[in-house]
Amino acid sequence: MIEARDVSVDIAGKRIVGGVDFDARPGEVAAIVGPNGSGKTTFLKALSGEFAYTGRIALNGHNLSSMRPAEMAVHRAVLPQATTLSFPFTVREVVKLGLVGGRSGALPGEDARLPERALARVDLDGFAGRFYQELSGGEQQRVQLARVLCQVWAPVLDGKPRYLFLDEPVSSLDIKHQLIIMNIARDFAKRGGGVVAILHDLNLTSMYADRIFVMHRGRLAATGSPQDVLSDDLIEKVFDCRLRVGVLPAGNMPFVLPQSSVY
């Protein structure tokens, strides 16, 4: 489990995240949503150990501030918003970087085949020999996800859940691949791991998230299930946009259409 209590982050003397309480449980997808500049990525970087913070964050019972990077890498893998490479790596070489720590959790002898298996999962079968720089933005994003999957291939290792931290994992993808990637996240959670994902698409969030954490001006504005959180009033307050939230009869699933704008 990931637990964060009263977490704040200051950058260049300015408070970006203030007093946030958060928890991510194994077996669920936790989505962080909010407008641009609300502190989502900054908070995720604190959760992943990249940014300094005040307050307390625990990862599987361990105080995050006392964990070494190699130790954190066993428990969680991070997909950033964007990754730039300056050298002509092949796709397979990029994906293999996820195996550097040697704790993928794959069965003995399977590590050598993991890059190809991970690429197949993100619908890039046959791309291993291509150069990374030759790919489109969406293809590069999926290569990076394959790398991350190799790092924590087994969602549970030594009896402890592992976590995927995904910062806008579908931002560059067409609708088919958005669904593929979100199904990968859901499957990872179903098999005992946990997922923390920053998302902008409220409909995908409603479809896949077990709980939503809504950030606004560096603080949490709401927390709960999609049914509890997504409402006309909250969207107007947080996103400064008057939209009507509909509900699908099957599963009581909320949805939001831009055509419902009531300006």
Swiss-Prot record:
- Enzyme superclass (EC): translocase
Database matches in SUPFAM superfamilies: P-loop containing nucleoside triphosphate hydrolases
Q: Which CDD domains match?
A: ABC_Iron-Siderophores_B12_Hemin
The keyword Methyltransferase is assigned to this record: no
Q: Name one GO cellular component term.
A: plasma membrane
The record's similarity note reads: Belongs to the ABC transporter superfamily. Heme (hemin) importer (TC 3.A.1.14.5) family.
Protein name in the entry:
Hemin import ATP-binding protein HmuV
Lineage of the organism? Bacteria, Pseudomonadati, Pseudomonadota, Alphaproteobacteria, Hyphomicrobiales
Q: Which gene encodes it?
A: hmuV
